[in-house]
Amino acid sequence: MQHELLNGVIPIIPTPFLENEEIDEAALRNLVDFACGCGIKAACLPAYASEFYKLTDEEKLKVVKIAVDQAAGRIKIMAQSNHPSLKSAIALAQANVENGADIVSLAVPRIFTLPEDSLMEYLSGFLSAIPETPVLIQDFNPGGATISPSFIKKLHETNRNFKYLKLEEPLCAPKFEEILKITEGSIGLFEGWGGLYMLELLPLGIAGVMPGLGVADILQKVYEHRINGSNEKAFSIFERVMPQIFFSLQNMELFHYAEKELLAARGVLKNSIARKAAYIPDHSSKKYISELNERLVALAQEI
C-alpha cells in the first residue's frame, strides 16, 4: 500500500459536552476548524484525551463522522478505535474507515496484564481486518512495560499497514532509537504524554508528537524550529509551554479539565465539562491552571 508517512504534531481532539453531558456537535465542529488552522497535517479522536472510555460505541463513531465531515480534506482524520474486545475493535475500525477516516488508531489493551503472544494475536487480527488502511498502534501503560522493539519489528514485518507507533513513557530515548534502527525508519514513531519529551526525541528521528489540541499550534512551531536547527527558538517556546503540560498530566482527568479550560480561554470552547466521573480540582489548582492557560494564550498570540 502507498502511504506517505505523516510528521509533526498530531493533536488529540477532545470531546465537548453540553450541560446534560450529551456531545456538543457544534463545539466539536469548532474544535476541528481550530485544528485545521494549527498548521498540522492530521488530528486524532476519540483517544484517551477525548474521554473515549466514557463514550458509547455509537458516540465513538459519531465524533469521527463529524470530524471527517468538518475537516473536509483540510487535514487527515485519525480514528481511534479502542476496545478490549478484538471483535468490537474491528467493528469500530471498519465503520470508521467506511465513514471516511484516513488512518485508524488502536490502543494496546491494558485492562489486565497479557503475555506478548496474546497481544500479537490481538493486534495482528486487528491489522489484518483493515489491510488497506494505515494504522497507528498506541501503547499507554502507566507504570508498566510497553511492547518491546522485537515485538514491534515482528508485527510490522507481518502487517504492512502498521505504519505508526505511539509510545508514552519516561526515559524512552534508548528504546525509541532501537525501534528506529531495527525497523529502518519504516514506522512513523510518535511520542505521546503531551509532547513532554519532544526536544530530546526529535533529534533521534521520531516523526512527531501527539499532544492535546490546545497547544497544537504552539508545539508545531517548536517542532519546526527543532528539526530545522533553530534550537534556541525551539527551547524558548517550549520552556514557556512545558509548565502547563507538566501540571495537567499529573492526572488524566485533571488533564481534561485543564485542556478544555485552555480551549475556552482561546475562544474555541464555551465550557470545560467532562463526563462524570470527572476530576473536581480544588481552588488552588483552578487558579493555577487559569494562570498557566493565560500565559499560553499570550504565547500563542506572540508566535
Predicted regions and their residues:
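Single-residue recognition of alpha-helix capping/boundary positions
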Residues: A27, E59, F151, S284-S285
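Catalytic alpha/beta core domains of metabolic enzymes, predominantly
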Residues: L127-P131, F140-M252
